[in-house]
Amino acid sequence: MIEKREFYSKEDLIASSRGELFGERGPQLPAHQMLMMDQVVKITKYGGHYNKGFMEAELDIKPDMWFFCCHFIGDPVMPGCLGLDAMWQLVGFYLGWIGGKGKGRALGVGEVKFIGQILPSAKKVTYRIHFRRIIHRQLLMGMADGEVICDGKIIYTATDLKVGLFQDPTILS
């Protein structure tokens, strides 16, 4: 049985990337530079806009992060796709937290809006995920809406984020 907590540290998230947090066959987060959060500060089975689950995670921004030196030279900004990927990462993490098994794969998103940006001068990015539905069929799939907040201001929103857990992800090829 997986110990469910409301808070997960950076060390816990790194353990997840090695497959050590959610047990054998549990979903994994990406490792190192592609891990887009430093901690999960809240995770609940109820709550959020739809009372079907909620997560909040944070990333401390440092001016020397890898993407600032290459996106773009002379005009550094965090790629928006990394914020979107962070939201997918969190949906997959939640599926492991509720006991799901398999390899996580992003399956789509309804609509994404970028209304701000993350610059090297930013201090903290907060991600909020509001679960709409969890489907238990041949695969376990989470559906959620998300927000990316930079220093207290909502800068990205996404609707209908979808992540599934697959026993054999090669079926997607």
Curated annotation (Swiss-Prot):
It catalyses: a (3R)-hydroxyacyl-[ACP] = a (2E)-enoyl-[ACP] + H2O; (3R)-hydroxydecanoyl-[ACP] = (2E)-decenoyl-[ACP] + H2O; (2E)-decenoyl-[ACP] = (3Z)-decenoyl-[ACP]. Its main location: cytoplasm. The gene is fabA. Its EC number is 4.2.1.59, 5.3.3.14. One of its GO terms (cellular component) is cytoplasm. Keywords: Cytoplasm, Fatty acid biosynthesis, Fatty acid metabolism, Isomerase, Lipid biosynthesis, Lipid metabolism, Lyase. This is 3-hydroxydecanoyl-[acyl-carrier-protein] dehydratase. InterPro entries: FabA (IPR010083), FabA_FabZ (IPR013114), HotDog_dom_sf (IPR029069). The active site is at 71. It comes from the Bacteria. GO terms for biological process: unsaturated fatty acid biosynthetic process.
